[in-house]
Every structure is written in C-alpha cells, then in structure tokens.
Amino acid sequence: MEEAVESPEVKEFEYFSDAVFIPKDGNTLSVGVIKRIETAVKEGEVVKVVSIVKEIIQNVSRNKIKIAVTGDSGNGMSSFINALRLIGHEEKDSAPTGVVRTTQKPTCYFSSHFPYVELWDLPGLGATAQSVESYLEEMQISIYDLIIIVASEQFSLNHVKLAITMQRMRKRFYVVWTKLDRDLSTSTFPEPQLLQSIQRNIRDSLQKEKVKEHPMFLVSVFKPESHDFPKLRETLQKDLPVIKYHGLVETLYQVCEKTVNERVESIKKSIDEDNLHTEFGISDPGNAIEIRKAFQKTFGLDDISLHLVALEMKNKHFNTSMESQETQRYQQDDWVLARLYRTGTRVGSIGFDYMKCCFTSHHSRCKQQKDILDETAAKAKEVLLKILRLSIPHP
C-alpha cells in the first residue's frame, strides 16, 4: 500500500564536508568512525578499511533517499507523483490534484516500486512574488538527494533558475515535461517532430545559462506506462545506489586521501634525514626494489595484504601481485643508484671529487626514494578508491 505523511520537522544536520551531511543523532560517519578509518589507512591495514566501510555501507543502506518534486504551480507535480507511483488520483493515498493549488506544504509519499525512497511533493513556485532563492531556502532544498524539475506548456525562467541553482549546489536533478497528451492533441506537427522541438527548447534554454545536460523525460500523467515513463523509472532505479552512496564515497575517499598524503609527508622527512633504515629496517638505501617493497607494505599494498582484501571483498581484482610490477625497470636502474651510493661512501675517495660524489649520491638516492614513495602512494589511493566503489551495492 502507498502511504502519505505530513511534513515532519527536519532533523538537525551537522556539516562534515562538501560531500555529505551527517545527522547529529546518527553514527554513520561519526568522528569515531572517521578516526578508525584514518588509523587503518595510516597503519596500512587495508583489510580493516574494508571491514569499516562494510559497516558504514550496511548502516547507510537503511537510510531513505529524499526526492523533491518541484516546478511552477500548475505544472502537475502532484499528478506526476501519482503516475510515477502507478496509482490513480482517486486512490486513498494519492497526492491531491486539481486546477487550484492543492499542495500547501511539503508532503511525503512512499511507493512499493521504490523502497527506501521518500517522494516529496513541494508547493509550486510562482504562485507568489517569492524569488527562486527564497523559495528554495524555505523548502530547505539542501536536504534532498535528487530534485525532479517538472514543467509543462513552457520551460519558464523559474525552471532555468532552478536548474542553475541545482548545478551550483552540485545537486543531481532530472527535468520532466508533463502534460504531453495535451501537447500532442493540440499540435499540428507529427509526434516525432513535436517531441524533438520540446527537447530542443529545454536543452537550448539550459545551454544558454551553461547548465550541463541532465536526464530529460517527456511524459503524460494519464499514460504512466507510455512515452518516457518506463525510461524514467529505469533510470531512477539505476541512479538510486549512486544517489545514496555518492556523497559518502566522496567523503570517505577525502579522508583516505588526506591520511595517505600526511603519511607521505612524514616519510619524506625520514628520507631527507636519511633515516629509512631506522623507520623501515631498510638495509641498503640504494636498493630501489627493497625500498619499494617496504613502502608497499607500509601502505598495505604487499601481496599478502591484497590477497586478504580480495578474500574479504570476494573480488579477485585485488588478488594480483603488485610486488612483481615494475620489478624489471627497477632492477635495470638500481645498479646505477647502488654504484653511486657505494662510490660516494668509498673510503679511498678524497677531496672535492669525494664531496661532489657524496652530494650526487645523496641527491640521486633521495630523489629515487621519493619517486618510489609518490608512485606507491598514488597506487594506494587507487586501491582505496576501488575498495570504496566496489563496496557499493547495485540492484
């Protein structure tokens, strides 16, 4: 059964980053959880990262996705919501419709076709002299995950302003043209030509304001199984996981990236101080292969760690040896650095040539060590991002 509820009080939100809002009463991305991820990344415990991310994803999977339906008054937003839910206007839990303004405040509807989704019917824009900016502020548009901009008869300046604001806020949005049945019944053009004309008009209006192209659907609320309605439902079903987890993945990656960068800066200080032996137990600072293996282990990219990640994620893509990658290149280049190192510290070397060789040796050694470190850190970020993306459930 479809359900409708009156607009509840909006929960307080704690702003954590540009990517995601965190409910104050929730623990999905609490400070403690973030610290656990930072510690795991810093210590190279990639398997622990997988475990923590799984916990977070499981918690988020129970969260509702908030979809706001908005547009000018009279565009048929309530009728569109009923058609999207595949219920008639006369049914008990349908959104009220009529020629007068029927939606006075944000109202939430549910549908068995879209579990874990809240469809919010917002009051139409344009019934008063209220600006788009004040309207969006009053509707608290920032709390919604997806905005559906509904238009009919004309794609007005208000619709364009809505799209501009959504792009500026980095909000995902769809454009839906309703009342297509009326257009088809009154137009003298063939149907394909009329559809192209409507699409071109919307696209041109948005392109003039440098709004990137977003999904666009032409529908008739009286034919919820025809025109672009099936395509709209299919697109929405595919987008729901992305909508639900995109901000979360972005935020988690920012945490991981920041932690990796901090670890890199710390190791570079050890390189400058010629202290890799103490910190990593490296016996030969001129041995590029030994250094690379030590750095890979530090970031959890050694074969054993990646094998454990593959088992934990049940994904064979992580079960490939990284220790064997680029080995041949380092074996070819390593003798040059090693020879410089040995020559620079040879007891028999004296005077200016000795000092010059020592400087050259130290400079070359530090440069190669930092190059290896940067390559390993970049690979660590790739692996962490892959873990986050592959952790997202798909329908």
From Swiss-Prot:
Where does this one sit in the cell? Cytoplasmic vesicle membrane; Golgi apparatus membrane; Cytoplasm, Cytosol
Q: What class of enzyme is it?
A: hydrolase
- Cite the binding residues for GTP: 72-79, 97-101, 179-181
Record PTM: Ubiquitinated; polyubiquitinated in the cytosol, promoting Gbp1 recruitment to the T.gondii parasitophorous vacuole membranes.
Cite the IRG-type G domain residue spans from the record: 63-239
Q: What happens when the gene is disrupted?
A: Mice are highly susceptible to T.gondii infection, due to impaired ability to mediate clearance of acute protozoan infections. They also display strongly increased activation of the Casp11-dependent inflammatory responses when exposed to extracellular lipopolysaccharide (LPS), bacterial outer membrane vesicles or Gram-negative bacteria. Mice lacking Irgm1, Irgm2 and Igtp/Irgm3 (panIrgm mice) show resistance against M.tuberculosis one month post-infection; then, panIrgm mice display higher bacterial burden and altered cytokine during late stage of infection, leading to increased mortality.
Family annotation (PROSITE patterns)? G_IRG (PS51716)
Query: A GO CC term?
Result: vacuolar membrane
Keyword Ubl conjugation attributed: yes
What InterPro entries does the entry give? Answer: G_IRG_dom (IPR030385), Immunity-related_GTPase-like (IPR007743), IRG (IPR051515), P-loop_NTPase (IPR027417)
The observed outcome of changing K379A is: Abolished polyubiquitination
Sequence similarity: Belongs to the TRAFAC class dynamin-like GTPase superfamily. IRG family.
Q: What exactly does this protein do?
A: Immunity-related GTPase that plays important roles in innate immunity and inflammatory response. Acts as a dynamin-like protein that binds to intracellular membranes and promotes remodeling and trafficking of those membranes. Required for clearance of acute protozoan and bacterial infections. Acts by participating to Tgtp1/Irgb6 and Gbp1-mediated parasite killing by promoting their accumulation on the T.gondii parasitophorous vacuole membranes. Also required for prolonged loading of ubiquitin and p62/Sqstm1 to parasitophorous vacuole membranes.
Name the chain's protein: Immunity-related GTPase family M protein 2
**Organism, scientific name:** Mus musculus (Mouse)
Gene encoding this polypeptide?
Irgm2
